[in-house]
Amino acid sequence: MTLQINAAFDGGNIHVVEQDGNRIYLEIIKDNQSDFFQWFYFKVTGAKDQALELVVTNASDSAYPAGWPDYQARVSEDRQDWQMTETDYRDGMLTIRYTPRSNIAYFAYFAPYSMERHHDLIARMAGKSGVGYEMLGKSLDGQSMDCLTMGEGRRSIWLIARQHPGETMAEWWMEGALERLTDENDSVARLLRQKARFHIMPNMNPDGSCRGHLRTNACGANLNREWAEPTAERSPEVLDVRNHMDKTGVDFVMDVHGDEAIPHVFLAGFEGIPDLDKAQDKLFRRYRNKLAKYTPDFQRHYGYENDEPGQANLALATNQLAYRYKAVSMTLEMPFKDHDDMPDLKKGWSPERSKQLGRDCLAILAEMIDQLPISGKDLA
């Protein structure tokens, strides 16, 4: 059987440059109409028991070259169990080594979350008691912008994920959060649904997800730089969601992401927005502190530098939503690399840990739910 490489499937991304026996030289393809690239996902067939060397030759030109040192690629032979494999970054090239036990092996930047799995998730959750579904609009490629709703309370809670499609851990987080929220035997879920109304977007960027992009939608727009002035022509995904937020109000919002370079889980807030409300900021810090005490997978030491007062970029979701609605707003970041605080030499940061973090984040939200504002009022 001849060794072949293919990425012509949902979320796939790779270009074969040259093959020299079991050493294959590859390039990651740029996002459409963009210079961003780092996400890869492809399959190798016909290489059973062969020691593969897969060399990504353009790694140094990727969006975040600091993401490659100490990184290990993910591999699976059944597309269910994803493990890390020997990977090194040297002279601007990323080399992945693996010996398949069967004739099919899949390699990815992180465990993929396919659009088929997304549709399965939406259908499974929409069929549960008390869960509603709304299509808030369509993407540039015509895909539905899927929103799940639940809860009877007055506080408006928004959870959004995967503005950057290559950050697949964000939708794994969503799967864990949704499974907990819809568990009728879970007291945390019951409390939250009693006290709040949830609006949940598991995938903000379906086009980029399907196309195998790292950070952009179909036309090359970075959705997390579109929240100040979204347009139907460039970023309908953001425009439709923000328009709906204008109708529902936003009291608490978490925007879920992955970070290429920082091997930790952390939160970023909105301290640089104009006219920062100290009580609003205090609630964010309280949430962050409680989460750090609750799970060893979260920490407060590593993360992004704070914006100077009044200097926040209001094109980012967290800043815009905190400013626009006086919401307790935050960005959650998870690593592509292994997790330095609690390393796992076999899987690294994984879908399973992402899902568990989704459950844990809800536990802290339940602790604080009575302290949150209602429609931007009553900050305490």
Swiss-Prot record:
Species whose genome carries this gene: Zymomonas mobilis subsp. mobilis (strain ATCC 31821 / ZM4 / CP4)
Cofactor(s) needed for function: Zn(2+)
Any one Gene Ontology BP term: proteolysis
Residues annotated as catalytic: E333 (proton donor/acceptor)
Pfam families, per database record: Pepdidase_M14_N, Peptidase_M14
Name under which the protein is recorded: Uncharacterized protein ZMO1242
Domain Peptidase M14 residue range list: 111-369
Residues that, per the record, bind Zn(2+): H164, E167, H257
SUPFAM superfamilies reported in the protein's UniProt record: Zn-dependent exopeptidases
Single GO term (MF): zinc ion binding
